[in-house]
């Protein structure tokens, strides 16, 4: 890599000691966790009977652009594992070298403190970013997932069946229709980046007389198998409230209700993985992209979350990080 410069990220890790020890090596950069001059108060965190110092994510890279790209990938990876909108992000790396700092960010010298963000699981985000950095399709898939999430995403509590409400239904606002649609487009594009989209055509459609075209089915099952995803795995598909016009237009090949589905409002069902990808493809190609389909007014946050969380599941699987370490292996999301 040649000589490397040091860049501060402002990302403060509370749980660095619970993950494999750094360094984490990406393509053209290296991540370490070091004591930071910006950590205020005691900087101590208790885990069980152990007390550990918080540490900052430090990027060593050959230049600013490389370090900044690494930070962007860490932010994308963190959004991938959290599955939620970000309260805030640290947007820029800060050079340790004073001359480079003055050249890039002269105002930083007059600030009493750098921007920081402290939370858990930054080491996991760094590990994901490092692995993804070696493959262009993985880098762009991460970026597209983050872009989709910024366009529209919701907190898990808002989709938790025990907190089910009707406030995430159909929106009367055109801006929301566009936001929902293009979040779906971006999320499905992340699936395309990792090569797990449905590959069908006019001459070789995905379905023939209501059944899978064996050629198309075998193809997607093989591509899933190559990245370590079982095509027989089911994926929970959120269905809330009365069926929308979109739901009525495309019958879902349900494998049965989810364990938590109760009553007429929470109708979540299990789909085979390949069927979930096919329905996501339908939402992308027939509803959300190109000229707006009249059915776009029936898109809801649940449609967006279904495609976004499917992209998350497939991307984490393709990168070798499914399930996240704090989930039970039988959890889907």
Predicted regions: what they are:
Residues 129-333:
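Amphipathic, oligomerization/interface secondary-structure segments
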Residues 1-182, 301-305, 309, 313-333:
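Charged, non-catalytic interaction/linker regions at domain boundaries
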